[in-house]
Amino acid sequence: MLVTVLMLGFVSVVIALGMKAYAQVQKFSFWVGNAGLAVVCLFLLFGSNQAFRAGLEANATKLFGAAPGVYDATIAAGQAAGAITPLFGGTLGVIFLAMPYIVFFNLWPNWGATLYGEVKGADDFRKNLSGMAYALILTTLLAVVFFILVNKTITWDFMNNANAAYWNYRWGYTTEAPPLVAWPYPAMLAMFTTSSPILQFVVLLAMSFWFFGWAGTVFLSSTRVIFAAAFDRVLPEAVATVEPRSRAPIWAMVLMVVPGLIVSYLYIYNKPVFGTGFASITLASTLVIAVTYLGSTIAAILLPWVKKDMYEASPIAKYKVLGLPAISVAGVIFGAFLVFLLYQWLIDPNALYGIGLKNTASVTFMGVMYLLAVVIYLVAMAVRRGQGVDLGKVYKEIPAE
């Protein structure tokens, strides 16, 4: 809990300094993390499985008190947990079932779309498009290269089984602790190929800078939403107050930090909510990013017909596919993919993902959050109506910049 409080303090200070200061922190953290990843990849590229096994045995015993033979014992524990996913091969059907896992991970690089409005040149849709596309393509390529390097030195078999053994115990499916009691962090495992504790520490510290650069983004996007809601009169005007020098929305930050402390406490100590440990309740949280995109996709499909004047005045209007608006064609394709993903995640007919309707508490929690948002809006609408303000007109159409 102390670490959480310190991180919240760090994030609050950095964001309170303003966008320019946070951008510098993020840029520095990004490149330090990249340097750490590059070193990890070099050790995986030039290392060997024999060196990794020897390093694992030595470090797991010294650092985590593991018994001798941790490599073989970890594979056995993972197999007992049911880890059978290969790195290569598989039928087309199996590949499609793997997509929801991959997209669940890849939703996060695209999550930056919520902040693209604050990027210089955001009014040029081509910059937004290229920014999102490059982020996804680069992330995917790095993941592929990294998996290949992991398979070369650590082996995919060990990595997969180590995770299965760890999470099988972590989520309470077995009472027997895994041979490797620490989470099998790939960077940590890669650095086991060196016997230098100083080098291990420096590289892992460098990799951790990604977290410091990313952590502020969670509050940055959320505080901007809270600020916008106050600016549009859904929340009290005081919430839109900004600090004169940094122009940071101070009260919006407070509305994030205080609930953040409460949620962190519930998560760290896994307090029961809806009869289930809070950690399990959060499993469906990433899913709502896809739900948000689905709503935007439907709006994009209908835009050329529902808001024809607005559409024809936009740069995207000149792009057609077989005479049809490109935005609608792309929207139908992407929308169908999102519906497939949401079906697999929520219905989960093959019991693969653990975040759907079978995880009743998690889905209920997400539903309560949506319901809370509706209640806040309806209450605000009633209050503002009494003040002579029609919120319906405020949200009917976004004004042109």
Where are these regions (language model features)?
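Membrane-interface loop-to-helix entry segments
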Residues: 2-68, 107, 131-138, 286-294, ...
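C-terminal membrane-solvent junction of multi-pass transporters and transport-like membrane proteins
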Residues: 11, 25-28, 32, 242-247, ...
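Hydrophobic, small-residue-rich membrane helices and short re-entrant helix-turn-helix hairpins
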Residues: 17-27, 107-146, 223-245
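Hydrophobic alpha-helical segments and their helix-loop junctions in multi-pass secondary transporters
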Residues: 34-81, 147-157, 293-310, 340-347
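TM-loop-TM module centered on a large, flexible mid-protein loop between adjacent transmembrane helices
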Residues: 68, 74-82, 131-215, 235-282
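Membrane-helix boundary/coupling elements in multi-pass transport proteins
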Residues: 101, 106-115, 194-237, 293-300
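Alpha-helical transmembrane segments and their membrane-interface junctions
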Residues: 256-271, 335-355
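Short, highly charged, low-complexity non-transmembrane loops/tails of multi-pass membrane proteins
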Residues: 314-319, 386-401
